[in-house]
């Protein structure tokens, strides 16, 4: 193979790997979103309606009970399906790592880790600033209360 042909093959290989990784990311994002959404809706459905006037008769209560019960069962099944898909994704990732270039993945993982560390650092600074602001406000509020209100026993 000539130099140009090797470069084209390497470029094509990198593009293919990038597409596969993007597909893995999409699958991961979709399955995690499905887990979160269904869990949220199960928790929402588990809330008890305190308004007894909403049901004029016993049939309305039973209808709502069975509707919610079936909805929760379906959502639980969707969570199981998403979990199963995540297990398959893990297997596919292991297979991909065994069969493909480790250097490319290592580079992408290190890049993602550095982005995460940068984001974490920024969020930590933001949290510290907010913590300081809240502490200052609380201190000023306590001083104001102490100066203006006499709390004697």
UniProtKB/Swiss-Prot annotation:
Using the UniProt record, give the first listed, main subcellular location. nucleus
Among Pfam families, the record links this protein to: Med22
One GO BP:
regulation of transcription by RNA polymerase II
Q: Does the keyword Transcription apply?
A: yes
Gene Ontology CC entries for this record: mediator complex
The protein's name in its UniProt record: Mediator of RNA polymerase II transcription subunit 22
Provide the assembly information: Component of the Mediator complex.
What keywords tag this UniProt record?
Activator, Nucleus, Transcription, Transcription regulation
Q: Where in the cell is it found?
A: Nucleus
Q: What is the protein's known function?
A: Component of the Mediator complex, a coactivator involved in the regulated transcription of nearly all RNA polymerase II-dependent genes. Mediator functions as a bridge to convey information from gene-specific regulatory proteins to the basal RNA polymerase II transcription machinery. Mediator is recruited to promoters by direct interactions with regulatory proteins and serves as a scaffold for the assembly of a functional preinitiation complex with RNA polymerase II and the general transcription factors.
Q: Which family does it belong to?
A: Belongs to the Mediator complex subunit 22 family.
What's an example of a GO molecular-function annotation for this chain? transcription coregulator activity
- Source organism: Caenorhabditis briggsae
Q: What PANTHER family is this protein classified in?
A: MEDIATOR OF RNA POLYMERASE II TRANSCRIPTION SUBUNIT 22 (PTHR12434:SF6)
């Amino acid at each position: 193979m000539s130099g140009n042909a090797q470069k084209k093959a390497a470029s094509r290989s990198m593009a293919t790997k990038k597409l596969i990784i993007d597909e893995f990311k999409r699958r991961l994002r979709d399955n995690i979103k499905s887990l979160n959404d269904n869990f949220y809706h199960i928790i929402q459905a588990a809330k008890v309606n305190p308004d007894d006037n909403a049901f004029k008769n016993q049939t309305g209560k039973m209808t709502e009970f069975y509707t919610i019960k079936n909805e929760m069962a379906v959502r639980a099944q969707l969570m199981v399906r998403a979990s199963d898909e995540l297990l398959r994704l893990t297997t596919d990732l292991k297979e991909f790592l065994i069969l493909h270039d480790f250097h490319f993945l290592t580079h992408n993982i290190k890049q993602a880790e550095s982005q995460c560390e940068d984001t974490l650092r920024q969020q930590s600074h933001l949290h510290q600033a907010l913590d300081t602001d809240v502490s200052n406000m609380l201190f000023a509020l306590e001083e104001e209360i102490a100066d203006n209100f006499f709390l004697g026993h």
